[in-house]
C-alpha cells in the first residue's frame, strides 16, 4: 500500500493573518480582550443577565461576547467593559522588539 504524503503549511502564529484578514491585528486584539472579559465573568460567577445589566446592553449581545462573535464590539468598547468589571486598564507604549519586523499589540494580565 502506497503512503500518501500530506503537505502542511506552517502558520505565522496569528490565525487571522494566516486567513488573510485585512484587519488581522484588530481581530486578534478584540479576541484577546474578549478572552480576558470572559475570564473575569467566569471568575465572578456572573450570569449573562447580570453582565448585561452591568454593561447596559441586551443579554443576547453578552451571549455573542461569550461565544467570541465580536463583530459588534470595538476594542475600545471591550476595554470599557473591562473597567466596568472593576479592573484598571493601562496602555504601555515601548520600542518594538528587535526580533519583530513591526510593532505588536498584545494584552497582558497583571496579577
Predicted regions mapped to residue ranges:
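Short polybasic/polar patches that bind polyanions
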Residues: 17, 42, 53, 83
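Short, solvent-exposed alpha-helical "recognition" segments
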Residues: 69-74
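A general secondary-structure junction signal
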Residues: 93-97
Amino acid at each position: 500500500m502506497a503512503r500518501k504524503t500530506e503537505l502542511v503549511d506552517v502558520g505565522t502564529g496569528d490565525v487571522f493573518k494566516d486567513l488573510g484578514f485585512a484587519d488581522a491585528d484588530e481581530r486578534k486584539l478584540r479576541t484577546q480582550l474578549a478572552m480576558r472579559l470572559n475570564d473575569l465573568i467566569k471568575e465572578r460567577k456572573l450570569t449573562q443577565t447580570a453582565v448585561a445589566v452591568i454593561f447596559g446592553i441586551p443579554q443576547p449581545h453578552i451571549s455573542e461576547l461569550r461565544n467570541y462573535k465580536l463583530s459588534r464590539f470595538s476594542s475600545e468598547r471591550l476595554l470599557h467593559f473591562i473597567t466596568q468589571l472593576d479592573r484598571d486598564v493601562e496602555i504601555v507604549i515601548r520600542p518594538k522588539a528587535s526580533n519583530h519586523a513591526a510593532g505588536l499589540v498584545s494584552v497582558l494580565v497583571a496579577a
